[in-house]
């Protein structure tokens, strides 16, 4: 677990100076760069959506929560649905990053990512609950 935490920190730490520079710049170039960065975020989400249905159960990538890790069928269903949603969400992020006023870009991107994650986690919980209810009905 410590190795994973260190790798996350080593990936995130270099991003802070870049984000600070992007935030502090006020020239036209920074606005274009800002749009470019968030368009790239959208493209990354599209890529994630494309590969998510193909991911097998693992401890590195995907929605690694108790319900998905315990049941391969729930893992598959959640990642297939999430793949479609992340693909669509990536297009929405890339589109809005290019055309929406700059002051709205960050709240919209954060909102889209929050909805994508929360829907996928809720979907996993509902599938697990449904499977548990089905299992309990068979026991009677």
Regions from the PLM with identified roles:
Residues 30, 95-110:
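Extracellular/periplasmic helix-loop-helix junctions in multi-pass membrane proteins
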Residues 4-13, 51, 77-88:
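Select subsegments of transmembrane alpha-helices in polytopic membrane proteins
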């Amino acid at each position: 677990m410590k190795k994973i935490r260190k790798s996350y920190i080593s990936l995130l730490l270099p991003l802070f100076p870049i984000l600070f520079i992007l935030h502090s710049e006020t020239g036209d170039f920074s606005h274009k760069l800002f749009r470019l960065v968030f368009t790239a975020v959208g493209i990354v989400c599209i890529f994630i959506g494309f590969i998510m249905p193909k991911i097998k159960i693992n401890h590195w990538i995907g929605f690694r929560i108790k319900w998905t890790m315990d049941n391969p069928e729930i893992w598959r269903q959640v990642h297939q649905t999430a793949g479609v949603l992340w693909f669509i969400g990536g297009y929405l992020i890339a589109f809005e990053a290019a055309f929406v006023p700059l002051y709205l870009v960050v709240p919209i991107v954060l909102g889209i990512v929050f909805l994508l994650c929360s829907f996928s986690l809720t979907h996993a919980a509902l599938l697990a609950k449904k499977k548990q209810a089905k299992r309990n009905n068979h026991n009677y």
